[in-house]
C-alpha cells in the first residue's frame, strides 16, 4: 500500500539598495559609544547593591544568570575601552560587589563563567588586578567559591549535574581561568575535567551530541568546541587542541554555509530569535583571534558582524534601554523567560564588548580599513553528516542557491515533533516554524488508529544525498512518537521515504508512505507557517497558496493521491 504527497515551493525576494562599505575606525567608535551610553544608563539605575534591586529600568533582575551577565558586560567594556569609571562608579569595585551577589545566591554555570571572565578582564595577575584588590579577604573567599565549577560539575561521576552535555565546556572554561589566575592550583582536577569535556571530539567526532545518545545536534556543538578549545588553549593542553582542530574547521565551514546574510546564525534548534544574532559577534570574534579556522576572508566576516550589529541596534529600544525580545511575533525558547529580559539585554552588551575589540584589532592588524556592508556568501548545496551509523544517522542539508536559502536538519529535538528540529527548510524566506512547539511545520504528523501521533524526525534510518547536493533522499521505518522521550523510536509498520529536490529555482518535497500490511491512519496533517502577512485565497482553491509581504512572496503548490483539505489560520 502506498500514498504520495508532493509539495513545490518557490520564493521571490524584493531587494533594496544599500551603502557599499563600512570604515573600520568608524565602527569601532560607533560600538564603543553605544556601549558606554547604554551601560551607563543601566548602571545609573542601580541606587544600591545591598540589597540588589529586583527591577532595573522597569524589568526584573531575578532571572537566571542576570547579575553575572551584567558584571561581565561592565568588565568587558572596561577592558575594551580602557575606562575604569562609568556613571560615576568605579567599575572594578562595582563588578567585585556584583560577584558577591552571585556567590551568596549559589549561582552556577554561566553566572560562574561570566564571573571568571569578568575577573580576568581586569588582569591576569591577581596582585595587580583592580577587582581582586578591591575585595576584603572574606570577599575573596566568596569569589573563590563562585569560581568553583563543582557547583554544577561532579568530579566523582565526571558529569554535569542535570544539565546538557555542552555545559562541560562551560565548566572547563571556569576551571581553566581559575587555574590561570591562581584561584585554584589543582591541575589533576582541571585535566580530568578537560579530558571528560573533550571526549566526543577526542573519540573522532566532528560534532557533539548535546543529549547523548539521542543525537541532538544544533548550534551548541559549535559553542561547545570553541569553549573546550579556549579552555585547553588557556592552560596549554596542546594534545586536546590537536584533537579538536578538525572539528572546529568543519564546524566553522558549516556555520558559514548556514548563516544568513543579515547575521542570523543557526536557523534550527533551541537558539531562535535574538540569541542567533548574538551568536555572530561571538563566533566572528573567535575567528578574528584564531585565523586558522576562518572559513572566509576576514573582511566578509566583519561584514557579517556588521549586519548582526545593525540588526540588534535597530531592534534596541533606546527609550527603554532594552532589546525587543518579547515584541509581537517574536518567538523564544522557554528558558528566555520574562524575568530574563534584562539579562538578555546586558548579555548583548557583554558579547558585543568582548568580541568587538578582537574583531577591530584583527582588521587593523591586517590592514583592512574598510569592508563591505554585506558579506559575500558563497552558493552552496551540500549535506553535512553529524552522525552516520547503521542504527540512526543525522545531519543537515544546507542550501544557498539564488533565492532558495535554508538549512534542513535531520536530527533529534528536545521533544519528538519539536518544530525547530523538524526536517523542514528552516531559514527559507517567508517560512518560519513556530518556536518550541510540537507542530507539523512542513513535516507531516500522522495520527494512527490507536491514538499515537508519529513523526518522521529524530534522525533517519537512511540519508542519501546526491553527489551535486541538489537532491536529498531520506527514509524512516522507525518513528518518533509525540509524547514519548527523545530517542524512543518505534516501528509502527509504516515507511516514509522523502525526496527533496532543487529544480528550476524551486524546492520540491515528495513523500511516499508505504506499508507491507494494511494500517489505519486516522489523520494526516501538515502546516505551512509563514511570516508573511497576506495570502491569495483564490490560489488556495486550486491547490496552491501564495504568501505575500513587502519583503517578497512564498508560493507553495501541493497535491496528493488522497483527499486533502486546506484551511487558513491567522495569528493576531
Enumerate the language-model features and the residues they cover:
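Extracytoplasmic/secreted proteins, especially bacterial periplasmic and envelope-associated proteins
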Residues: 34, 69, 170, 220, ...
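Short, low-complexity, charge-dense intrinsically disordered segments
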Residues: 3-10
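Hydrophobic h-region of N-terminal signal peptides that target proteins for export
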Residues: 10-18, 59, 71
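Extended polysaccharide-engagement surfaces of secreted carbohydrate-active enzymes
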Residues: 261, 265-268, 275-563
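Non-catalytic all-alpha helical scaffold/repeat segments
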Residues: 24, 28, 32-53, 62, ...
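Aromatic-lined, polymer-binding surfaces characteristic
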Residues: 57-284
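Boundary at the C-terminal end of the N-terminal hydrophobic targeting segment
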Residues: 17-21, 25
